[in-house]
């Protein structure tokens, strides 16, 4: 096993089979650095040598292609500067920022990024559980002690804390909470309070799934407001029943591509460095598969190995 760069604890598995084949399961992989992890561009030859992996009869790579159809469009430093500018302008206008995130990986990464950029942060939802694991308990304790980070507390005043944070009663503190889809989690409670306020901003930092409330927000936010220009959010009541809330969207919205998955060029670098005899591609759309397949064929030409899309329940002959 070796680290994959995707998130704390993610790993690439190398398996030597009795028939002499060597299997490499990349899992989710990231070739670029994040706030809490260092990217992994290639597998080191010294690591492969430890298990005599180059001596395998064949090397079979099973990898992902979440971003197989696209390369990085905006550098991280430029993106960070744009994020800081958006937040500073929001504070100047008297608004607040809501950043719905995936609780694992993205949440701790975004909290760490906001702190590095000089902001105090309010954290809610499942991110409270993953933050200490991914940034470290010692650092989190420091942030809590000096007031850099506030965690929402369970209790009778839970809903009041949501309203206070949403309306700036704790000062300007961007709110980081799950879930990134806006279909569930504490993010829905904050969105109900914040989306109707023109001075606020909703910030997306990850993939926007088709059919999700987050995707719908970015499809309507620039349209004239009026009847029908709302999104319906599903909020859990005290009895854990889903209740629909129609929310009129008046705040602005911005997307930042802080993906934790390798881009196309990074996937090509990983594959070509390994020099596999067979490649299977999973965890992707058809566009993602075709994008990576085309890039590998362009890079390797006649030396390109067979490449197959590893769709669910499809059989392949090795």
Short names for language-model regions:
Residues 1-116, 120-124, 138, 143-146:
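His/Asp/Glu-rich metal-coordinating catalytic cores
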Residues 271, 275-281:
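Proline-aspartate-enriched helix->loop->beta-strand connector
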Residues 81-213, 221, 282:
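Hard-cation-handling environments
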Residues 10, 33, 107-110, 183-185, ...:
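Short, well-ordered alpha-helical microsegments
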């Amino acid at each position: 096993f070796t680290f994959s760069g995707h998130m704390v604890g993610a790993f690439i598995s190398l398996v030597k089979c009795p028939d002499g084949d060597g299997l490499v399961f990349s899992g989710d992989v990231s070739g670029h650095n994040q706030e809490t992890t260092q990217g992994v561009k290639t597998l080191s030859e010294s690591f492969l040598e430890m298990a005599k992996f180059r001596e395998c009869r064949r090397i079979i790579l099973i990898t992902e292609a979440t971003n197989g159809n696209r390369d990085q469009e905006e550098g991280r430093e430029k993106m960070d500067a744009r994020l800081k500018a958006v937040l500073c302008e929001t504070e100047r206008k008297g608004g607040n920022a809501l950043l719905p995130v995936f609780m694992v990986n993205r949440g701790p990464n975004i909290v760490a990024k906001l702190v590095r950029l000089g902001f105090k942060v309010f954290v809610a939802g499942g991110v409270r559980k993953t933050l200490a694991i991914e940034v470290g308990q010692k650092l989190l304790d420091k942030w809590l002690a000096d007031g850099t980070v506030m965690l929402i507390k369970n209790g009778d005043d839970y809903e009041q804390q949501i309203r206070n944070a949403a309306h700036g009663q704790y000062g300007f503190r961007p709110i980081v909470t799950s879930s990134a889809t806006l279909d569930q989690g504490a993010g829905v409670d904050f969105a109900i309070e914040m989306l109707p306020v023109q001075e606020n901003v909703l910030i997306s930092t990850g993939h926007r799934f088709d059919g999700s409330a987050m995707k719908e927000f970015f499809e309507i936010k620039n349209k004239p407001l009026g009847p029908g220009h709302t999104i319906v959010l599903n909020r859990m009541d005290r009895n854990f029943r889903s209740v629909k809330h129609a929310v009129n969207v008046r705040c602005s919205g911005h997307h930042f591509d802080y993906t934790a998955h390798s881009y196309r060029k990074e996937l090509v670098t990983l594959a070509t460095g390994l020099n596999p005899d067979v490649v299977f591609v999973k965890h992707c759309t058809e566009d993602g598969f075709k994008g990576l397949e085309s890039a590998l064929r362009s890079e390797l030409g006649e030396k390109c190995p067979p490449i197959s899309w590893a769709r669910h329940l499809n059989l392949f002959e090795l």
